[in-house]
């Protein structure tokens, strides 16, 4: 009996070994060094945070930074055949999780050892973890992978370039189906994890603040795309790969939940910036109660064009040029990976018993980017790009406390310190002597026009050094010079 048990255990151990024998692994990735100087120290490593206003003395002294945290590695796994499809997997990690408290989504004070320590021990993070079934014209994907909005980036030196203007950066757990037809057309759809939207900080929006307010709405994020690609007159390089004329449209939607907010009459006061107290589930002489759910619906539509201007019909890229452009419109666009949305809106809707009721509204934005690239030869090429994003549909009327609150519908209570217009310009000279080595030297300019004018802060008590309108500002800018080196493996 003991012999049969031993044989059974050995056979059980052999089953996964036999399955693994049909699997092939390949290692890929790159080692990257970034060296940069910024005139405005409020921007993140990836230029995904707004530059501070030019009258902010704390952030306009410059910053010099060297980092290798953009390095990454990945495994491509070729698995067995199943249902007539080839099964493959992809797992990728990098070290770009936390930089210095200024990276989008990373709170100040949580930067850890990497910021202040002598040994820059950045924490690894998961980028992609997915597997897929590939048939000749179809693909079914499961796992964490790129959003459909993230397929066309400008080729600049920073990671996730133009996150504030041209292309969002988002990777979400998803189920995606892709179908090719008629040779040149591709359609795809996904359902995935909904993302957080940025509600005003003075309001407790979700029922459980520790839970993503997209997940609280219990609806997935959905995306769909249509792509047309055809070699009409030749190809040009996109990240070094010969690519034909391509046109693409992507759309996305999700739902987020919050509570309709009511505010205490005796705490809001004459505050135009929206820092009054929020009253929830409280009844008193000066407080109200409103228990209705409110749903907000982030959505975005993006159109992309890749145009070979000076094409090639071979792998020789010398003398080739392209134009790439993305243009988009939406609301709550941070749910799809755009940065620099500091808050969404609360608008005064009505009043009851002289109490003030406010309703959340998502910030509406549009924007885009355009890139031109030219290859002098197969080693040297030049890249120039411009991106812009703009908030629209924002009333500048602010609700002030008064004897009566009737007739003031749609005036805003608070919208955070949002930028009305963001612009980015980058010029990058690239040198790639061999496929494994790539160097870049870049100048980039970023500028933000804010809705609000702010006086400069100074002193321990935060008193402006000269409290007059001459010192106020609604504009911030950053000049960056960056060198980058890659070793691909």
Regions found by a protein language model. Name each.
Residues 77-83, 134-137, 181-183, 230-232, ...:
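Outer-membrane beta-barrel strand-turn architecture
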Residues 159-299:
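Aromatic- and glycine-enriched pocket-lining scaffold segments that form the walls
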Residues 22-47, 53, 57-200, 216-236, ...:
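Outer membrane beta-barrel
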Residues 44-49, 106-110, 158-161, 204-208, ...:
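Flexible, surface-exposed loop regions and adjacent strand-edge segments
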Residues 62-68, 121-123, 167-169, 214-219, ...:
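Short sequence motifs at beta-strands and strand-loop junctions characteristic
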Residues 224, 238-423, 427:
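Detector for outer-membrane/organellar transmembrane beta-barrel domains
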Residues 224, 475-489:
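Outer-membrane beta-barrel "beta-signal"
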Residues 8-16:
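Bacterial N-terminal signal peptides
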């Amino acid at each position: 009996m003991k012999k049969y048990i031993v044989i059974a255990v050995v056979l059980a151990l052999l089953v996964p070994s036999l399955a693994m024998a049909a699997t092939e692994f390949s290692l890929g990735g790159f080692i990257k060094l970034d060296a940069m100087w910024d005139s405005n120290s409020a921007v993140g490593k990836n230029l995904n945070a707004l530059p501070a206003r030019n009258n902010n003395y704390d952030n306009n002294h410059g910053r010099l930074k060297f980092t290798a945290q953009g390095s990454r590695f990945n495994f491509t796994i070729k698995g067995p055949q199943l249902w007539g499809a080839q099964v493959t997997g992809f797992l990728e990690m990098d070290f770009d999780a936390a930089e210095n408290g200024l990276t989008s989504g990373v709170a100040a004070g949580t930067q850890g050892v990497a910021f202040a320590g002598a040994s820059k021990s950045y924490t690894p993070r998961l980028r992609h973890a997915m597997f897929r079934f590939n048939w000749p014209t179809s693909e079914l994907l499961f796992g964490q992978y790129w959003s459909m909005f993230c397929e066309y980036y400008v080729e600049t030196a920073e990671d996730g370039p133009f996150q504030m203007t041209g292309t969002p950066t988002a990777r979400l757990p998803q189920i995606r189906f892709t179908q090719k037809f008629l040779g040149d057309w591709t359609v795809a759809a996904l359902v995935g994890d909904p993302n957080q939207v940025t509600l005003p900080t003075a309001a407790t929006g979700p029922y459980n603040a520790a839970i993503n307010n997209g997940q609280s709405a219990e609806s997935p994020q959905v995306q769909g795309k249509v792509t047309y690609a055809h070699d009409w007159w030749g190809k040009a390089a996109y990240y070094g790969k010969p690519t034909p004329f391509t046109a693409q449209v992507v759309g996305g939607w999700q739902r987020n939940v919050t509570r309709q907010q009511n505010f205490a009459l005796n705490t809001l006061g004459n505050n135009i910036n929206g820092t009054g107290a929020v009253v929830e589930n409280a009844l008193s002489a000066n407080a109200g109660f409103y228990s209705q759910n409110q749903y907000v619906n982030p959505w975005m539509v993006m159109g992309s064009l890749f145009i070979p201007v000076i094409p090639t019909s071979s792998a020789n890229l010398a003398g080739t040029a392209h134009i790439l452009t993305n243009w988009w419109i939406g609301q709550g666009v941070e749910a799809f990976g755009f940065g620099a949305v500091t808050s969404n809106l609360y608008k005064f809707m009505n009043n009851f018993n002289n109490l003030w009721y406010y309703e959340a509204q998502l910030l509406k934005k549009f924007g885009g980017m355009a890139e031109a690239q030219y290859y002098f030869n197969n080693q040297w090429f030049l890249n120039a790009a411009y991106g812009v994003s703009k908030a629209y549909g924002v009333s500048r009327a602010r609700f002030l406390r008064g004897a009566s609150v009737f007739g003031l519908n749609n005036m805003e209570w608070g919208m955070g310190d949002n930028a009305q217009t963001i612009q980015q310009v980058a010029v990058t000279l690239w040198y790639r002597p061999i496929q494994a080595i790539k160097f870049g030297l870049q100048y980039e300019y970023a500028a933000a026009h804010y809705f609000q004018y702010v006086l400069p802060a100074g002193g321990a008590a935060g008193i402006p050094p000269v409290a007059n309108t001459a010192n106020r500002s609604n504009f911030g800018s950053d000049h960056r010079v960056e060198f980058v080196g890659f070793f691909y493996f």
